[in-house]
Amino acid sequence: MTMYWYNAVDNLYKQDKQKFLKLVELKAQIIKETMAFNIDDYGSTLILGFNPMLWSICKEDDKFEYYAVCTDEHEADFIRNHEDLKHIKVLTDAEASERKFDIVLALDSYFTRFGTEQSQKDMIAKAHSMTNKALITTIKDFKNMKSVDRLIDPPMVINSDSGSHVFLCHREWDKTDKQKFKETMYQLCCGETQGVVIETKRTLYFKQLAKYIHDLGCKEFRISQTQFYKNLFSRSYEYIAVAKV
């Protein structure tokens, strides 16, 4: 059964909320430590696209403002209607573009969702323009990946009350465009395929990201060499990039 990314996340959340929230909080803590987060310095965050981090970032602070903007209206409606995401204000693209946020989060290699070099560059510029303090993104080191790692991520197993869920991420690379690939994530449980998520993506290299950010006039840009981030359903590490405006 082909599904959206948010369906796979929500299915896991509903099966074992306590474990899910623990996993998400661990990822949130890594992001906070990497950017030297201090709640007194930041008052709002905008998350690009649906992401499990919606359940966690600074949720314990009533004064902190949480926003999300999605290119996919299905994602936006899902967040708006979710009973446990009422603290998130979902904005339209026009609404998000009219204001500034202290933090903009583009996680899970978000910019690889854009299929051309120009569309990636444009989206990075747009994300940068929405923040007045920091843009945080995560990125895989596609340049130095081993051949086998370019094809498949190590399987991820998450145990829940309903059984062991195995997540397997496979990539098929375009034969004419070496940076383009189709990514398929399979969710398996109890001998059955619970769901399949398919997305077409494009690699984004460190040097590309750094150049695009510096061309925008960023005063500070760094990629963490000590703290690493992992997608909720993957054991494959992503680097955390922090751009201070």
Regions found by a protein language model. Name each.
Residues 46-96:
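Class I SAM-dependent methyltransferase SAM/SAH-binding core
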Residues 102-120:
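A short SAM/SAH-binding and catalytic strip from SAM-dependent methyltransferases
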Residues 118-135:
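A short glycine-rich, Lys/Arg-flanked "PGG" loop and its adjoining helix->strand segment in the class I
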